[in-house]
Structure formats: structure tokens, C-alpha cells
Amino acid sequence: SVICLYRDDTGIMWAGTYKNGINYYHESIFKFQTIRYPLELMRDIFNNDFNCIVEDKEGDLWIGTSGNGLLRYDRETGEYVRYRAGRESENAISGDVVISMAKDLDGKLWLGSYMEGLTGFDGKRFKHYRDIPGSKDGLSNNSVYSLYVDAKNRLWIGTLEGGLDCLDQSTGKWTYYRMGDKENAINSDIVYSLSGDEKGNIVVGTSLGVNWINPETGTVTSFNGTKDGRSVFEDQIINVVFCDSRQWVWIGSNHGLHIYDRLNDKMYRLNHSSGLPDNSIMSILEDKYHTVWVGTKNGLLNIVPNRDTDNNYTFDWNSYDENEGVQGRVFNVNSACGLETGELAFGGTNGLTFVDPARIRYNSYAPPAVITGLMVNNVPITAREAYDGHVILDKDITCTKQLKLNYTERNFSFTISSCCYFLPLKNKYAFKMEGFDSEWTTVSALERRITYTNLNPGTYTFKVKAMNNDRIWSKEITSLQITILPPFWATGWAIALYIIAGILLAYGVIRFIFRIQQKKLEEEQERATVRQQHEVDEMKLRFFTNVSHEFRTPLTLIMTPLEKLMKTEKDMESQQILKLIYRNADRLLKLVNQLLDFRKLDMQGDSLVLSTGDIVPFVRDVAY
């Protein structure tokens, strides 16, 4: 029982119950309606695996299932009528595994089954078409995977291994397109999906790519990418093809979604790396607002193209799951149908989901982001409690606008949250540390702890914003200014001391270099003086040497005649005079020879010869 109710500022209605906790509701949470076949009516196969859907002219839905046969659902009464395969009666569907359906221009239903052929139903009787060995006409394979009716009421039949068949209902003529044909061959005999463009061409999705078929000429072309060759289409197994109102072709595979803009010859690709919840694209439809809805193996998407100034497109999308009324996360291949009411119906492994674009209510509340926690060096920090000898927070982190951290505290984490409780797991967050990050980083609701390590000392601004379950971002950004103090060796006083020490060191180095240069200059000047003195001495010595050479020859010429005169002169007085002349001439010759010997010694041409002797006669000779 409900004992209290409360409606908050965001429009959520909270209900407090007796012994059963708290419940909440908002019209934007449950966006979709889902139907399932009642379990009490299932007598043999218990599942709601819906493979295909078609709406008849009365507005009833025909649903092909995996083992439960064909269901007719009356939306007004909510009642089901089930049609099962009957071996004993021809007026029944051909098989209980119905994997494809189509409605022709006459209102006739066509059912494709797994290994049981094709069935036509005019509202009264079922007519069966099977692959008859040896027959030139008729169905080429009993596993009919896809059906499509074109503008001329031709029925196109995609089979598992028989290629593509075309039945012209006005003439009863069958046309076949197969892999390996000499002309107009398709890529593969396994045809998974069919669609038609605005020109009447048939788009064929196979296990080996995509083909275009011109029904009037029978011409088959293979889709390899853009005409200019810049974007190449390489996916092989195609789950679904769909032509929209923009003349775009949407191609879904197990590797993501390709969108080909035929008018501008451009290709776009969306996959898990782009942000899609899953790469397996199963079904595609467009609503009246030109939003494209896509069933995947991990929820339902609505994709909105946005054109920029360069005529290129970007794509926004929302994903939905069972928490918002979707049948489940896994949708089936080609299990989608547009209804006369403007609704879309998507079948999956757990029922049928209706999408009514006109009635969907989106959550317009722009939730503010909140910083709810701080950790420093993996230690939780609380207000007014000391950490490492000082208090970091003087009030709760939620109310803090400025934060100072020591150099040893530059490894820190924030926990972020938002005040959006619609579907909190679908919230997203974007954060940026100005002064460190160059771009915003987006994270999911499961990644609410933001960590920074080893930031340099300085002032930063941490900014965070939140996105709600319907992709509405915060109007205001939550900011926190963070100052990381430098270590003691990087403070202003330390830097001033470093500058002074550097100046003194530079001065000492300059003085040292100056003294070395000055000493070198003095030594060079001294060497120049010595060199100059040596040159002067050398000049004098050369002069004396030359003069000595000039003296030596005349002295020799003087002494030789003197010797002869001394021998012939009889007069004692004259002889004494001659001896005096001879002795002084000899002395002068010895001095000349000594001067020449010194020159030889200086030129390293002679060596000093030492000898012993009586110095008295030597001195007497010199004196007298």
C-alpha cells in the first residue's frame, strides 16, 4: 500500500509504500509500449520471439514468430488469434517458423518460412509455394528470408541459398537472379534483406555485400562504395538494407551501420567505436519526423542526422532498453514495420515494441553536475579533518570552490554525480582540467571517479558537466579551482637564492676566465719581449761574427810575414817589437776564433770541450 506521495522539482513522482520501499515514476521514463503473447496461451513453445510484422487494412497486426506460428493481434481488444502449420490441411500456414512477411497492393499477405516455403493469404485461404525439383517456374528455395513488394505489385523473394526470385502477380511470370549467372549476377544466393528506392530500384542485402537491381531492365550492379573511390564498402554479411526519404541507403551488418548519401556520393559509418551500444544492426525504419530508428542486439536507437555548413552530416542518437519499455535488448533481423498511425513496430526476442514519435516525452531537466568526493593519494578526504598534518577541506567538497594541495598531494581523485534520478545509469559526464587537458573527456555513469596524477605546480580549474538519460547537458558547468603548491626547493625564496648563486657563480667564472686570459696575454708579451731581445742579440752576434770573419783573414796574413821576419831579424830590439806584435796578433786571432766557436755553439754546430791546464801563463798572456 502507498502511504505517501511526493513530486520533486524535476517532475518525478515518488511513492513511499508500506514494507515495499520507495518507487518513482515519470512519463519520460517509459517511452514505449510493448506487447507479448500471453504465457497462459502458450501450450508447447514458450517464447515471444517475433521475427516479422505486417499491418493489414483493418489495422490488425500479423506477427511471425520463431515456433509459435503466425499471430494476429487486434490492438483494440488486445486479443490474439494464432495460426499454426497443419500437415493434414492445406488451409494453414506452411511452417511455424515465420521469418519474413509482406503485404502487397491488393492487401494479400505473404509469409516466408524457414525450410517450409512461401505462403500467400488473401484473408480466407492460404496458398503454398514450394521449391519443386525439376520445375522451371516457382520458388527456388524453401527458406524465404526476406520479402518486398514494389510499386508494380511484384513480389521479391530473398531465399537462403536459391538467390533472389521475383513474381510478377499480373502475369504470373517468375524471374530469377542468382550468383554465377553469366549476366546480371548478384553477389550471393543468400539474400537477407530487400528494400526499394524512390526510382523503383531494388536494393538487395546478401551474405556477400549489396546489389542494386533495375526491375525494368534487369540490370544488376554491385555496391562497392562511393563513386569517387574515397570510401570503400567492405562489409560482407548484410543484415538489413533500408532506403529513406532523403534518398539515403542505410546498410546494417554485424560490423556497424553504413549510411550512403546517393545525391552527394558520401558515405558515413557508425559503430561501437563511434558510440553505438552494439555493432549488430538488425532492423531500420524512418518515422514521419525523419528520425531513423534502429534495432540492434543491445537496444533500440533513434538516430538524428545533422547537416553542417559544408553539406556534411553528423549523427546524434539515443539508445533505449527494457528500463524504458522496450521489449528487451535483442531485436530480430528485418523485424520492423511502419503503421498507418505513424507508429513504428519493432520485434525482438521478447515481444513487440511500439514507437510513437508524437507521444514520446523526453526528459528536459538539465541536471547540474556535483563533485561529491575527494581522495588524495587514495585516501578519502573529509571536511575539517587533518591529512598529513594539515586540513585540506574546511567544508564539504560539494560546497568548495577553491582547493589548495601540497606538492606531495598532487595525486588526487574526484567523485562526480548529478541530480538526475530518471535512469541514472544512462547519465553521462564530461570533464576537463583547464591548464592540463586540451579537450573534454566523456565518461559513463559507471566511471564517476576522475583521477589526476603528478600535475605540475600551478593553478588549474576542474570543470564538469552532466547529461541526463535523454542527452540533455547541464546548462551551467561546475568548476573547482585547484592550486598545487610547489615543493620547498621550487618556492620563490629558493628560486631567488638560485638566481643569486647563479649570478655569483657566473661572476666567479668570468673573473677566472679574465685572469686566465690576462695571464696568457702577459706570457705572450713576455715571450714577445724575449723573442725580440733574442733577435737583437742574434743580430749583434751575426754582426760580430761577420766582423770576426773579416778580422781573421787579415790577421792570418799579418802573422805569417811576422813569423818570417822574426826568423830573419837579427836586431834584438826589433825582434822584441816583432814578438810583441805577433803575440798581440795571435791573441787577437784567438779572440776571433773564440767568438766564432761561440757562434757555432749557439747555432748547435759545436760542443764545449773541457780541458785542464795552468791558468797562470794563460792570464800572463792575456795581461801582457
Label every model-predicted segment.
Residues 1-6, 18-23, 31-54, 87-94, ...:
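Residue-level "micro-hotspots" composed of small/polar
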Residues 7-10, 55-58, 103-106, 149-152, ...:
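Residue-level detector of Asp-centered blade-edge/turn motifs that repeat once per structural unit
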Residues 522-567, 597:
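Primarily the dimerization/phosphotransfer
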Residues 566-574:
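Short acidic helix/loop segment immediately C-terminal to the autophosphorylated histidine
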Residues 580-589:
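Short alpha-helical segment of the dimerization/phosphotransfer core of two-component systems
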Residues 589, 593-600:
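Short alpha-helical N-box/ATP-lid segment at the N-terminus of the HATPase_c
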Residues 599-610:
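Helix-loop junction within the histidine kinase core
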Residues 609-624:
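A conserved beta-strand-to-alpha-helix junction within the catalytic ATP-binding
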